[in-house]
Amino acid sequence: HYGIIIIMCCLLNACQPASQNPRIYDSGISQELAELRKQEINELKYDLRLSIPKQKSMPVEGEIHVRFRLNKAQEVILDFREEADKIKEVSANGLPTSYEFRNEHIILPKNTTQKGENDIYIRFTAGNQSLNRNDEFLYTLLVPDRARTVFPCFEQPNLKASFTLQLDIPSEWVAV
C-alpha cells in the first residue's frame, strides 16, 4: 500500500499546472512567463494616470487600469521593477484584493480573476529609474524592458496593447 501511495504522490507532482513552473517567478520576464501570458491574455488595454509634481524631489504618483481578456481564470503576473512599498493599492474586477510582490512581479491569485474581461487597478508611486527629471521638464525614453520601471504592466513586446495616458502636471507646464 505504501508503494501505491508513493507512486500516486509522484504522479500528482508530475502533473503540476504551468503556473507552478518556478521560472515564471524569476526576476525579469522569463521565456516561460512570456509564452504563458501570450497564450492566455488578449485585448490588452492600459489606462495610465500620472501626477507629476513641479519639484523633482517629490515622487510621481500614479494609478493604472490594466484591462484584458483571459482564456480562463488564473493567476496573473504583472511586472513592476520597484520596491514593494511603492504599491499602494490593488484591486481586481472592482474588489480590493490580496497579492504577492516577488522578484519584480505583482502576482494576483487565481481567485481574483475570471474567464473573459478583467480589470486590474493599481495605485502606485512611479519608479524614477527611467524618468529624466529636470527643474523645467521631464521626459522618458521607455526602451524595451523599461516601462516596468515606471508603472506596472505586462512588459513583453508580443503583447500589443492600446494605451491612454492622463497627466496631472503643474499649470505652467505643457505636455507634448
Residue map of PLM features:
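Sec-dependent N-terminal signal peptides
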Residues: 2-11
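N-terminal, polar/Ser/Thr-rich
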Residues: 8, 15-61, 134-136, 155-157
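Intrinsic-disorder/low-complexity, polar/charged segments enriched in Ser/Thr/Lys/Arg/Asp/Glu/Gln
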Residues: 43-47, 59-65, 73-75, 105, ...
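Beta-strand-rich interaction surfaces with strong enrichment in secreted/lumenal proteins
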Residues: 49-51, 66, 96-97, 107-112, ...
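Surface-exposed coil/turn segments at beta-strand junctions on protein surfaces, enriched
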Residues: 55, 71, 101, 113-115, ...
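Surface-exposed beta-strand/loop patches in extracellular or lumenal glycoproteins
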Residues: 63-84, 155, 163-170
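A surface-exposed beta-strand-loop module
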Residues: 81-138
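Extended, low-hydrophobicity, Ser/Thr/Pro/Gly-biased non-transmembrane segments
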Residues: 123-176
